[in-house]
Regions:
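Acidic/His-enriched low-complexity segments
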Residues: 26-255
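Bacterial Sec-dependent N-terminal signal peptides
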Residues: 1-32
């Protein structure tokens, strides 16, 4: 069947008018919502998270977390001899590169928000390396603004830690979305990063712990304490790291 020039012209005119209506609608939406005009770029990737291992204890009176961390990374593409981690409002005690089972100290700069670490050499994208950090997180002293949905961004919450309010349970829990996990452990705190996870929590023996993945061990830690280790073997974003400690009840079922 032969299509006339008139039909072709009408068809193209229809397409053009449809595109015009679409672009007009988009432009109108942007005028109505100025937030849509903001260009939200993904941060450049210099290093990729591979695995994050944490060993944490809590000071209920001061609302502190005492942490040890072994974070394994690799350069994203280009070789690099430096590493930048998000770490909000912490005391940084030690940073080392793990070499043959030994910790070799590294030089670093810290401005209360970012850790800039000089590695021991330049690593290629085919090489993994592990950095050890010893730190204290102080979430209640962190002055960070949240969003309309979540009014603050301190990441780690101590609930009725002294037991003074008899109507509230004593609990600890985290809320990391979208970039608040770096208030309780140093990391590259962006949803585009993905890492495996292992968390060991030392808590009073009377409490139950919750975290990502599977509970792989529970060991007495002396003085009425117990260390629980949770392990997640699926890569996930840092904001999904989760801890909860409290007088929870455990229910088990099979199906």
């Amino acid at each position: 069947m032969k299509i006339s020039n008139f039909s072709k012209t009408a068809f193209y005119a229809f397409l053009l008018s449809g595109n015009f209506v679409f672009f007009t609608a988009v432009a109108q939406t942007q005028l109505e919502n100025p937030a849509l005009k903001i260009y939200r770029a993904t941060p450049a990737k210099i290093n990729d998270l591979v695995n994050t291992k944490l060993d944490v204890r809590f000071n209920y009176a001061k609302h502190y977390l005492y942490g040890k961390e072994w974070v394994t990374l690799k350069p994203h593409f280009y070789p690099t001899d430096s590493l930048t981690l998000d770490a909000k409002g912490m005391d940084i005690n030690q940073i080392s590169i793990v070499k043959n089972g030994k910790n070799v100290p590294l030089k670093f700069l810290y401005d209360s928000l970012k850790l800039r670490i000089n590695l021991d050499k330049k690593y290629s994208s085919a090489e993994n390396y592990t950095v050890y950090l010893s730190y204290t997180a102080k979430p209640d002293q962190l002055k960070a603004m949240g969003s309309a949905a979540i009014s603050d961004a301190k990441g780690l919450y101590f609930i009725n830690s002294d037991g003074a309010d008899k109507t509230k349970p004593i609990q600890i829990w985290t809320q990391g979305e979208t970039e608040s996990s770096s208030a309780w452990f140093p990391t590259i705190d962006h949803p585009s990063q993905k890492t495996l996870e292992e968390i060991s929590m030392t808590v009073p023996s009377k409490y139950v712990t919750l975290s990502n993945g599977k509970l792989v061990s529970q060991k007495p830690a002396g003085n009425g304490l117990r260390t629980d280790t949770w392990k997640m073997d699926k890569p996930h974003s840092p904001y999904l790291f989760m801890m909860a400690v409290g007088d929870f009840k455990i229910y088990k079922d099979k199906w």
